[in-house]
Swiss-Prot record:
GO biological-process terms attached to the record: nucleobase-containing small molecule interconversion; pantothenate biosynthetic process; pyrimidine nucleotide metabolic process
Signal peptide range: none
Function: Catalyzes the condensation of pantoate with beta-alanine in an ATP-dependent reaction via a pantoyl-adenylate intermediate. Catalyzes the transfer of a phosphate group from ATP to either CMP or dCMP to form CDP or dCDP and ADP, respectively.
Protein name: Bifunctional pantoate ligase/cytidylate kinase
GO molecular function: ATP binding; CMP kinase activity; dCMP kinase activity; pantoate-beta-alanine ligase activity
Sorted UniProt keywords: ATP-binding, Cytoplasm, Kinase, Ligase, Multifunctional enzyme, Nucleotide-binding, Pantothenate biosynthesis, Transferase
Region annotation (Pantoate--beta-alanine ligase) ranges: 1-258
EC number: 6.3.2.1, 2.7.4.25
Organism, scientific name: Synechococcus sp. (strain CC9311)
Main localisation: cytoplasm
Binding site for ATP: 7-14, 130-133, 159, 167-170
Amino acid sequence: MHFVPTMGGLHHGHASLISAASCHKSGDVETLVSVFVNPLQFGPNEDFARYPRTFEADCELAELSGASAIWCPDESQIYPGGSAESWRIQAPKSLQSRLCGSTRPGHFDGVVTVVCRLLALAKPHQLFLGEKDWQQLTILRRMVLDLGLAVRVRGVPTVRDGDGLASSSRNRYLNAQQRQQGVLFAQVLSDARSACLHGGTALKPGEVKRRLEEVGLSVEYVDVVDPWFLQPSKSNQSSLTLLAAAVRCGSTRLIDHAFLMTRSPLVAIDGPAGAGKSTVTRAFAERLGLVYLDTGAMYRAVTWLVLEQGGDPGDSEAVDLVLNDLKVELEPLQQGVQVVRVNGHEVTDAIRDPRVTASVSAVASHACVRAAMTAQQQRMGKAGGLVAEGRDIGTAVFPDAELKVFLTATPKERARRRALDLEARGHEVPALPELEAQIVERDRLDSTREVAPLLQADDAIELISDGMSIDQVIDALEDLFRRRVGEEVWPTPV
């Protein structure tokens, strides 16, 4: 079951959520929409009593959007002992010390408490939430992760009305003049995003606040934070950050945000040989519409050419001579396969030969090779929109990548996979213990070489793939990506 929790007052934004949940259905999966105005989310003097309650209209919109059923529990079903006496979950302080959490104490504790209760009752497989309230989405993602709940969280892009104002149940409170102010609110944030993307310079929060006040808005906060940690970003300005703000138009509180970036997102996937990086990275790139940069293939291409010309992989001077005339080309993925060419010759299968595999570590250890390949890879990734896999992508090639993953598996598992790959390619398959010993030795060489050793970046997330299918690994990578990069920043291809 796919689940869309709401507080009612459904609008175009909710319709988009329900439609997304319905479009992801397969087989006998159903889409459930809940309507429950949660008292724990409202503070003193907030609008709990007058919050829109339009159940009949909600049912109609939900059905038209693809919902299988609508669930409208009463308070006693959600909080059997009453909301005042119910068990409560506390969201981490670091996730609610800024943005809306800084001015609405207890609000997100109420959100995580009710959603945890709804999930326990409904038991869905996937939970669909809007990216409009990014802080809420992030906190709920952390709740699911930290509590080990068996549900996958999916974010859906912010929906805007024709005039640019983000869809909200509270928009109906606005008169014509206030609505125009709300439109200007959205425009100021959009202008800040454009200035960063095209000019490379982000407006300071103080400047954004000044512009909002100039159009008559009462500003509650303007802040720039890391999209996952919801604290000021420590990365350089190439990385993605979240510009978020809350204002009041009359008595109506509005929130909105924009993602600031100077390029499209980058993903760096590192890990030891045989961890399945190439297989899953190719499929991940296709699913997300990212360009696939197979850096391992580039090093294999150099190694192949060295061997083809009779050179010694351990002789740096001989290898350097090969680099003078080297031209490596990686063609776009076609049905999961990336064609590799060296100086015009197609070598896609040749670079996977065991001779190349045995020598690639020695060739890649030369400083001249690393420098040449790193420079070429960085040129290819300058505009972003790319995923690369290798040994030092997150530490040397793209240290400012939005997502860094260290994908690994035990030597025994990697030996098993290597045997299957060799068999599929028609090569002779050594005994598994021999393959495992080769992998352990390769790890040692890669981790101890002087130039660009195999290392896990400090901010990389380790993903151990033993016992996981390829699809499960790709799902895990997609979820990690979406923690930081929303659908409204990089939409999943249809």
